[in-house]
């Protein structure tokens, strides 16, 4: 396949989206189910691995082996408070592997464990394949987005996930920055504009303030809540209906995982309906102990169930304004991002907060981030179209960076919301006489004492010549590149001795070897998935052949054209094969093909004889199946070997 353009991927907590910039505009690409967003879900079963819609659709039947929310684990330590509290809510197992979290599942009858990077890489592989199917070309270059909050280790781990998926990640950019780009292309303005981006997605909430002037973006502040989103609104509705079920039927369904799962799916659907209608009905057959649950919910009730959560979205807005030192009257544009911003009540609260100002909803909120990432991908891969040329992008550091000085004090070198790339240098000295070395400990965070901040890494600068305290001069430099990767160096001015560290959070990082191993495993899993698809297709082919052949010889139009002995021969063989199929659903591809050849050996001579005597058979042309068997009876039945297999799962 020829090489395709660079794509933009919004790797979301609950859903992901991919876009490409071509023919002077961005196209958001639909997956094989026709959806423009794909669930960030990976499921493992006895026979196969599923990614995206297929994984999410079977979650009710296979909750413990269906992994989602990998974005909440990526780049974190197992003992991170976030990981510990999230684990309580997940149906899948998270285990501790030398201080790093891994998800543990049953796959093809074995216990397997995967790093979050691997799970995210599976979702990225899916997004890559979606783009390739649409473009008909191989896709390798991509821009991938992350929340403005992500610290260094989370950004780096996301980049690793891209590498494992076989992508060359051109750049990791902040989601609000991407949304701003999507928006910046639509509105060319000369004067400086302050833009507030309100991003309420499936699992997270981010508010960012940017200024745009002459095509240059600058992020002024970011705020938000990593644990607020559409899923929380679903949960409120789920709890409401669990209580209603208790009242109506005196039964508690909350312990029955499958019932709750089915109820949650229905609630998510109802929530979406309530963004356009004032009421929604829910009908679930045999929800619990054979009881059907038919009920409805109004928009007003939904708003009341979530009143505190909806109102709470304004707190980060106020914080972002404070950090950017702006008054709400100074915001020129408000941009909505994330599916949950479709909720009318949220739009109203935000609009009222900004004294009736119109909101920008022109960009589909689910797609805005991928849209901007696609534009950025085009810029970075050297797209020359003028739509793209006038755009420059400045990203920021989400948290302050500094080192620990005497007494455990955090001394900041790079303040949060500093535009990157950036470089800052400061001179330090020794704390005691004849001190032979200094320990440079690098932290990120906003607290005054380092113990309350996050340690990124540390190194020692030794060999300082003996001198009284305060005499040696040690120059410390913090340098952040465009990808947000941090280099810290320390030089002793008198000797020129230097030591440095690249903070890619190695304790949370995968080693080169790990990544390479995972790339190979990803290839292996992909090959297994292919093999499984081929197997199913040869099984379906055999099944269709047997049933169609049976139907053909039993067709009354053939009465008298085929002698009973031949007919019986075919029927016996077909029934034998159908019985074999029932018992051997999981046989190998070769076995299905062998059975098909055996069946053809019996059928082909008889059918050929029929043709010669009848000069072509009534009612059907030869079907396009291996062995070209005739289609039966009235409607010619073609081979169903490669047709879609549709299964309804609640």
UniProtKB/Swiss-Prot annotation:
Give the reactions, separated by semicolons, that this protein catalyses. Answer: ATP + H2O = ADP + phosphate + H(+)
Query: At which residues is N6,N6,N6-trimethyllysine found?
Result: 561
Query: Positions of the region Substrate-binding domain (SBD)?
Result: 394-509
Q: Which GO terms describe its cellular component?
A: cytoplasm; cytosol; lysosomal membrane; melanosome; nucleolus; nucleus; plasma membrane; presynapse
Q: How does it sit in the membrane?
A: Peripheral membrane protein
Q: Which domain of life is it from?
A: Eukaryota
Residues bearing N6-acetyllysine are: 108, 246, 319, 328, 512, 524, 589, 597, 601
Quick one: where's region Disordered?
614-650
The region called Interaction with BAG1 is annotated at 186-377
Q: Domain description from the entry?
A: The N-terminal nucleotide binding domain (NBD) (also known as the ATPase domain) is responsible for binding and hydrolyzing ATP. The C-terminal substrate-binding domain (SBD) (also known as peptide-binding domain) binds to the client/substrate proteins. The two domains are allosterically coupled so that, when ATP is bound to the NBD, the SBD binds relatively weakly to clients. When ADP is bound in the NBD, a conformational change enhances the affinity of the SBD for client proteins.
This one is known as Heat shock cognate 71 kDa protein
Q: Which organism is it from?
A: Bos taurus (Bovine)
- Which gene is this protein's source? HSPA8
């Amino acid at each position: 396949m020829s090489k395709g353009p660079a794509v933009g991927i919004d790797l979301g907590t609950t859903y992901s989206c991919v876009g490409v910039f071509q023919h002077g505009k961005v196209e958001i690409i639909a997956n094989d189910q026709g959806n423009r967003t794909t669930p960030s879900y990976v499921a493992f079963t006895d026979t196969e691995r599923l990614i995206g819609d297929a994984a999410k659709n079977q979650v009710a039947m296979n909750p413990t082996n269906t992994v989602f929310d990998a974005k909440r684990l990526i780049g974190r330590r197992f003992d991170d408070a976030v990981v510990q509290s999230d684990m309580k809510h997940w149906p899948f197992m998270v285990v501790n592997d030398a201080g790093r979290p891994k998800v543990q599942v049953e796959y093809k009858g074995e216990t397997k464990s995967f790093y979050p990077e691997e799970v995210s890489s599976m979702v990225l592989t899916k997004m890559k394949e979606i783009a390739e199917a649409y473009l008909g070309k191989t896709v390798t270059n991509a821009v991938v987005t992350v929340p403005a909050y992500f610290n260094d280790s989370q950004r780096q781990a996301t980049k690793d996930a891209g590498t494992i998926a076989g992508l060359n990640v051109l750049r990791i950019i902040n989601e609000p920055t991407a949304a701003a780009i999507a928006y910046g292309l639509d509105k060319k303005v000369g004067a400086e504009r302050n833009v507030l981006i309100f991003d309420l997605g499936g699992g997270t909430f981010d508010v960012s303030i940017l200024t745009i002037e002459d095509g240059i973006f600058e992020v002024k502040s970011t705020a938000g809540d990593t644990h607020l989103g559409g899923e929380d609104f679903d949960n409120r509705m789920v709890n409401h209906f669990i209580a209603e079920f208790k009242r109506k039927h005196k039964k508690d369904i909350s312990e029955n995982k499958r019932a709750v799962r089915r109820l949650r799916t229905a609630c998510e659907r109802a929530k979406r309906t309530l963004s356009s209608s004032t009421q929604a009905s829910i009908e679930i057959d045999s929800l619990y102990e054979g009881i059907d649950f038919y009920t409805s919910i109004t928009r007003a009730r939904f708003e009341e169930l979530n009143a505190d959560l909806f109102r709470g979205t304004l707190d980060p807005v106020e914080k972002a304004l404070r950090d950017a030192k702006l008054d709400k009257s100074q915001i020129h544009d408000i941009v909505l991002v994330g599916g949950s911003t479709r909720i009318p009540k949220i739009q109203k609260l935000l609009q009222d907060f900004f004294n009736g100002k119109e909101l920008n909803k022109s960009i589909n909120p689910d797609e805005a981030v991928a849209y901007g990432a696609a534009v950025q991908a085009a810029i970075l891969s050297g797209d020359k179209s003028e739509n793209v040329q006038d755009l420059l992008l400045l990203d920021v550091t989400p948290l302050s960076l500094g080192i620990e000085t005497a007494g455990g004090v955090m001394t900041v070198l790079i303040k949060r919301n500093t535009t990157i790339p950036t470089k800052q240098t400061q001179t330090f000295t020794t704390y005691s006489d004849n001190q032979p070395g200094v320990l440079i400990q690098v932290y990120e965070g906003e607290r005054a004492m380092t113990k309350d901040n996050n340690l990124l890494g540390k190194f020692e600068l030794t060999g300082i010549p003996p001198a009284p305290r305060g005499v040696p001069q040690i120059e410390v430099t913090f340098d952040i590149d465009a990808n947000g990767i941090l280099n810290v160096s320390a030089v002793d001015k008198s000797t020129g001795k230097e030591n440095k560290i690249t903070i890619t959070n190695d304790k949370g990082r995968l080693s080169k070897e790990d990544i390479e191993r995972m790339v190979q495993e990803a290839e292996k899993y992909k090959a297994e998935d292919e093999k499984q698809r081929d197997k199913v297709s040869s099984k379906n082919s055999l099944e269709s052949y047997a049933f169609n052949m049976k139907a053909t010889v039993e067709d009354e139009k053939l009465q008298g054209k085929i002698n009973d002995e031949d007919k019986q021969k075919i029927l016996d063989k077909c029934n034998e094969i159908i019985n074999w199929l029932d018992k051997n659903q999981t046989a190998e591809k070769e076995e299905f093909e062998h059975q098909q050849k055996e069946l053809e050996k019996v059928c082909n001579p008889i059918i050929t004889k029929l043709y010669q005597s009848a000069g072509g058979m009534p009612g059907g042309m030869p079907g396009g199946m291996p062995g070209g068997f005739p289609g039966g009876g009235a409607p010619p039945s073609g081979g169903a070997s490669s047709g879609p297999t549709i299964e309804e799962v609640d």
